[in-house]
């Protein structure tokens, strides 16, 4: 009977540990979760401000294509070329790209801070859309083409994760929603 109780306790502890840390692709702490959390926070924030931010798979695909093109660019081998340059030079269309490297964000606090920084960068990027100085000095925002987005405009958003210059990046693409 004692052996059974010890075995049952060990199984319970193992089950609790697995549910707390998550495991496998798409589990807690994965890039997939981070991407979706960023998108959800932006949609919720816009909704709270009585504006509309719509996540679309087309925007996700555009973000993924941008990452692939930037990573494959021969200029990526040059240490003097930044990720910002690669994104700007390989994008088509009229977007704002918000990009940040991410490592293993193993705590909810670190994920919260990362997501908050992405959201804050997006707010500033839209607020200062006409200010080239903002974009020249920003390490995490770049204009692709000539985006025109007002602070009260509805937006379309999409995101993807991928490796550029040997670092993992989350790239959020934003454009003015078509009426």
Model-flagged regions — what are they?
Residues 1-11:
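Bacterial N-terminal signal peptides that target proteins for export
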Residues 26-98:
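Short, well-ordered surface patches within globular domains
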Residues 18-22:
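C-terminal motif of bacterial Sec signal peptides marking the signal peptidase cleavage site
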Residues 11-12, 41:
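A periodicity- and composition-biased signal for non-globular, repetitive helical segments
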Residues 9-10, 72, 179:
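Short amphipathic alpha-helical "recognition" segments used for binding
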Residues 2, 14, 32-36, 179:
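Short, low-structural-confidence N-terminal segments
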Residues 89-179:
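A well-ordered secondary-structure block
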């Amino acid at each position: 009977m004692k052996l059974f109780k010890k075995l049952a306790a060990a199984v319970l502890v193992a089950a609790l540990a697995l549910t707390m840390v998550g495991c496998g692709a798409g589990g807690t702490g994965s890039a997939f979760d981070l991407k979706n959390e960023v998108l959800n926070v932006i949609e919720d924030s816009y909704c709270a401000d009585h504006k509309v931010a719509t996540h679309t798979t087309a925007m996700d695909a555009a973000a993924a294509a941008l990452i692939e093109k930037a990573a494959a660019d021969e200029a990526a081998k040059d240490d003097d070329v930044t990720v910002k340059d690669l994104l700007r030079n390989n994008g088509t269309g009229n977007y704002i790209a918000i990009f940040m490297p991410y490592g293993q964000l193993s705590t909810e606090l670190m994920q919260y801070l990362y997501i908050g920084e992405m959201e804050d960068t997006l707010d500033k990027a839209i607020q200062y859309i006409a200010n080239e100085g903002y974009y020249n000095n920003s390490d995490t925002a770049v204009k692709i083409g000539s985006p025109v987005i007002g602070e009260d405009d509805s937006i379309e958003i999409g995101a993807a994760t991928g490796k550029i210059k040997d670092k993992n990046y989350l790239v959020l693409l934003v454009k003015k929603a078509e009426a």
